[in-house]
Structures are given as structure tokens and as C-alpha cells.
């Protein structure tokens, strides 16, 4: 299939394998969920009654005081006591096979093409790391909210865009399924598009 170039005459030919697949919502959901789960820190922790400091001595004798029986001041029933079912650090990551991941990326790229959310440009470079220059460039392309994927990550481009909300600049190797679906548009250079096509072929 051919994709039109924005801001220039001509088209770029891409493989149907990577850019003309049926949308598989269930697969995309599974891969995105797995990606977000893997990003969780999973470091929350609470102490059980045996881990809270103190409470080794029985606070009062078993019988005769008239008070309810107690064996430790760190019981979950007591203030400053342990937690009954204490949370512990855990790994939230979910396994996704490489074949599934690639298939999900193909279906996401294909859906971007179908929804006209993929903008292809010949190249994208700035003369200086100035935010004003970057905003002007985006205005030319009529883009406000976008993931920008470049084959050769230009320092000027990265520095000019890093302070702008709703814009992210990546190279082709560091894109992920969440970033692809999070923005209104995906602006990609021809070189980056070829790298993506090669990775998903």
C-alpha cells in the first residue's frame, strides 16, 4: 500500500503485512494491559502482627483483671497493631509472547492508517533547539497533540519539544503500544517508517 507524504509531493510504499491488518481489539487490550502492569512499581508493604516492633510481653495476666484477654499489644485489633492481611511487594508483570506483541503493534499501526491519524513526512529537523521553531513547524502540519517518531533523533528537535504538553519525541526503537494509542496523531519520518516496517515484517 502507498501512504501520502505530508508537506511534500509523492507517496511512500509500505508493506500490507505491517500497515493493513484487521484491528484486533482483544489482543491490543491484552498487550497494553501487560505493558502498563509491567510499569507498576509493586513495592507497597505493610507489617503483620509478627513484624511490628514490640508486643513481645503479654500486657496483663490472662484472668482476674476484668479486662478482655490480650496476648500482645500489636494485635490487629489494637491501635498501632499489625495489619491482618498485610500487603507485600509483588511483581505485577504479565507475560506476552513476542509474536503477540508484534501482532498487536501491526494492528495498531494499521488502525492509525485507517483512522487518518498517521502523518508521514520526508524528514523533521530544526535549525536550533528553539520551542518557537518547533511550534511553528507543528502549526504548518496542523498538529497539536502528537507522538513524533524520527529515524535519527535530532537533539534540536528533542530539546525544542520537551517542554510542550501533549507532544512526545521518540526514535523508532523506543515506541510502545501505549504511546501509539495515547496521542491524536502519530507523526513519523520516512526513515522511521521503514525501520518500523522492518521490525514488524
Curated annotation (Swiss-Prot):
CC per GO annotation: ribonucleoprotein complex; ribosome
Residues covered by region (Disordered): 39-67
InterPro entries per UniProt: Ribosomal_uL4, Ribosomal_uL4-like, Ribosomal_uL4_dom_sf
Cited function: One of the primary rRNA binding proteins, this protein initially binds near the 5'-end of the 23S rRNA. It is important during the early stages of 50S assembly. It makes multiple contacts with different domains of the 23S rRNA in the assembled 50S subunit and ribosome.
Subunit description: Part of the 50S ribosomal subunit.
GO biological process: translation
Pfam families: Ribosomal_L4 (PF00573)
Superkingdom classification of source: Bacteria
Recorded family membership: Belongs to the universal ribosomal protein uL4 family.
Name the UniProt record assigns to this protein: Large ribosomal subunit protein uL4
Keywords: Ribonucleoprotein, Ribosomal protein, RNA-binding, rRNA-binding
Disulfide bond positions: none
Amino acid at each position: 500500500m502507498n501512504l501520502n507524504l505530508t508537506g511534500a509531493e509523492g507517496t511512500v510504499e509500505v508493506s500490507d503485512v505491517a500497515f493493513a491488518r484487521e484491528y484486533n481489539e482483544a489482543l491490543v487490550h491484552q498487550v497494553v494491559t501487560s505493558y502498563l502492569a509491567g510499569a507498576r512499581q509493586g513495592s507497597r508493604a505493610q507489617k503483620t502482627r509478627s513484624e511490628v516492633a514490640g508486643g513481645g510481653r503479654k500486657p496483663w495476666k490472662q484472668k482476674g483483671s476484668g479486662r478482655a484477654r490480650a496476648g500482645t499489644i500489636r494485635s490487629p485489633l489494637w491501635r498501632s497493631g499489625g495489619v491482618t492481611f498485610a500487603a507485600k511487594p509483588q511483581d505485577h508483570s504479565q507475560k506476552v509472547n513476542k509474536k503477540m506483541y508484534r501482532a498487536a503493534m501491526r494492528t495498531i499501526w494499521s488502525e492509525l492508517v485507517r483512522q487518518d491519524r498517521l502523518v508521514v513526512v520526508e524528514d523533521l529537523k530544526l535549525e536550533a533547539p528553539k520551542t518557537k521553531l518547533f511550534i511553528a513547524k507543528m502549526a504548518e502540519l496542523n498538529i497539536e497533540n502528537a507522538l513524533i517518531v524520527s529515524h535519527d533523533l535530532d537533539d534540536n528537535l528533542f530539546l525544542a519539544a520537551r517542554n510542550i504538553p501533549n507532544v512526545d519525541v521518540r526514535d523508532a526503537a523506543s515506541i510502545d503500544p501505549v504511546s501509539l494509542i495515547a496521542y491524536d496523531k502519530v507523526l513519523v519520518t520516512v526513515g522511521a517508517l521503514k525501520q518500523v516496517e522492518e521490525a514488524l515484517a
